[in-house]
Amino acid sequence: MKKGKMIIISGPSGVGKGSVNGELLQNPDLHLRYSVSMTTRKPRNGEVDGVNYFFVSNEEFAKAIVNDELIEYAHFVGNSYGTPRKYVEQELKKGNNVILEIEVDGATQVLNKEPNVLSIFLMPPNPTELANRIRGRQTEDEEKIKARLDKALLEIPLKHNYQYVIENDNVPNAVAKITDVLHLEGLTDIKTPTVYERLEQIVEQIVKEKYMYFVNNWETNVKLLAKNEEEKNKAKNFDAETYLIKLLTKKVYHKVLGHGDFSKLLDKDFVDFKIQKLMFKINFFSVEQKHYNNDEF
């Protein structure tokens, strides 16, 4: 049986991790299990012990740390949060993927210690929307809300430590993006092609229609700029068309993951517009020619 994978879905407090994960867990093709965190904070209205969190005392939490029962833990706004190790390891052995809905501090610990991890950073559309979501909970006073917002400003720059950055402008859009990422990473039973694969086909059409003159000149220049025998041999195998298709696909895909309507990736006019902008921005002379075989993709 194939072992499951830990999936970190992290981001600032109030970004909507719980709402997104709740929807993801409804899809049986994703083989997802939710890792119930341990916390010392008081339950919010409607939260159930053992379902939403394991609510424990400060003493019990400290004991769990000493006994190495937590994969990660962090202290946040006067409370402690951690991920119990036993449940996660059991589910991974069963072939399930386990969502770790954790704060950025805890995610950093896991990324530094665990090799079998897929990491996703969930972004708010803007700071105002983040503040509105936190206030909308109506569970904390203004001082704690300010502390959460201040911490968010320190956490958001750490998004580049994650494999994928996904904006949660609305839950259905964010769920569609994450579902495709999981499919792309080979973690689902979904049989249809990924949006990424379909996007790559659209990009290929556009490159063939509009950019072959550029491609041919690029290949010629690479060969002319080769300085020694090793570089000349590599230049012979340089497939500029394939390289450009993969480069543009990757950039357009990640751009829309970070901001935009995911369904637009299947709109040829939209993709064409994005490619036009990228072609002016990419400095092709700075692209490392060591990747002649497209191995970075």
From Swiss-Prot:
CDD domains: GMPK. Its EC number is 2.7.4.8. The keyword ATP-binding applies. One of its GO terms (cellular component) is cytosol. It is an enzyme of class 2 (transferase). InterPro entries: GK/Ca_channel_bsu, Guanylate_kin-like_dom, Guanylate_kinase, Guanylate_kinase_CS, P-loop_NTPase. GO terms for molecular function: ATP binding; guanylate kinase activity. It is found in: Cytoplasm. PROSITE patterns: GUANYLATE_KINASE_1, GUANYLATE_KINASE_2. It catalyses: GMP + ATP = GDP + ADP. Disulfide bonds: none annotated. Residues 4-183 form the Guanylate kinase-like domain. It comes from the Bacteria. Keywords: ATP-binding, Cytoplasm, Kinase, Nucleotide-binding, Transferase. Residues 204-297 are annotated as: Unknown. ATP binds at G11, P12, S13, G14, V15, G16, K17, G18. SUPFAM superfamilies: P-loop containing nucleoside triphosphate hydrolases. The keyword Glycosyltransferase does not apply. Essential for recycling GMP and indirectly, cGMP. Belongs to the guanylate kinase family. This is Guanylate kinase. It comes from Mycoplasma mycoides subsp. mycoides SC (strain CCUG 32753 / NCTC 10114 / PG1). The lineage of its organism: Bacteria, Bacillati, Mycoplasmatota, Mollicutes, Mycoplasmataceae.
